[in-house]
């Protein structure tokens, strides 16, 4: 959890926002997936948001569902994902690592055991996409017991009650949703959510990172200009993996070319 705090403090000092890429662990295979993650970090990623392949990803659009299918085709298991996380943490001791996942994967292990394992491999945060805040108590309590930040989604239509709950229960960062619906770069991010950012600040919520539909540098700059701490980009990155699936070196080069201007857009 402290890794987020020190990251946001450093970025503030440098007058920068955070650029956070999302990829699915094990897509398109374990070895290439680890190279992809190294490349994202070398190109300027400030933190990582990682998915564990799951058979029924509700909040994901087709691009990220395909990533999950590729990881499954490569035989990637949750146990191997945790081995990968341990390797990533060993190699990159300071970068915040977040998991974006579904409740079934947490239940399969047992809630407490799952968060204990997260702590052991050096995961900083977990967002359970299909658990609404009013049902989140067992998850967030286990998370805090194991020094893992529970992350909550703030939808564009959040009312005051929800904003207060998010501020009160969330740690690490707040996942600010650009718009309703499923993930995907085809649907561009909506207008900057200034009023939500202001409210979250007022209630002392964890710093907001805006996600969903972030696929161009101007969409990274807009939320930061509106007061958000940064932006998360997933589908646009996963699409690059898909496009170069048979050319691993080209894929890494293309990822670098995509991430560098996205990170540059966080600098005021």
From Swiss-Prot:
It comes from Escherichia coli O139:H28 (strain E24377A / ETEC). The active site is at 49 (proton acceptor), 60 (proton acceptor). The keyword Amino-acid biosynthesis applies. Its EC number is 4.2.1.20. This is Tryptophan synthase alpha chain. One of its GO terms (molecular function) is tryptophan synthase activity. HAMAP family: Trp_synth_alpha (MF_00131). Pfam families: Trp_syntA. Tetramer of two alpha and two beta chains. PANTHER family: TRYPTOPHAN SYNTHASE ALPHA CHAIN, CHLOROPLASTIC, TRYPTOPHAN SYNTHASE, ALPHA CHAIN. Transmembrane segments: none annotated. The gene is trpA. Keywords: Amino-acid biosynthesis, Aromatic amino acid biosynthesis, Lyase, Tryptophan biosynthesis. The alpha subunit is responsible for the aldol cleavage of indoleglycerol phosphate to indole and glyceraldehyde 3-phosphate. Belongs to the TrpA family. Disulfide bonds: none annotated. SUPFAM superfamilies: Ribulose-phoshate binding barrel. InterPro entries: Aldolase_TIM (IPR013785), RibuloseP-bd_barrel (IPR011060), Trp_synthase_alpha_AS (IPR018204), Trp_synthase_suA (IPR002028). Pathway: Amino-acid biosynthesis; L-tryptophan biosynthesis; L-tryptophan from chorismate: step 5/5. CDD domains: Tryptophan_synthase_alpha. It catalyses: (1S,2R)-1-C-(indol-3-yl)glycerol 3-phosphate + L-serine = D-glyceraldehyde 3-phosphate + L-tryptophan + H2O.
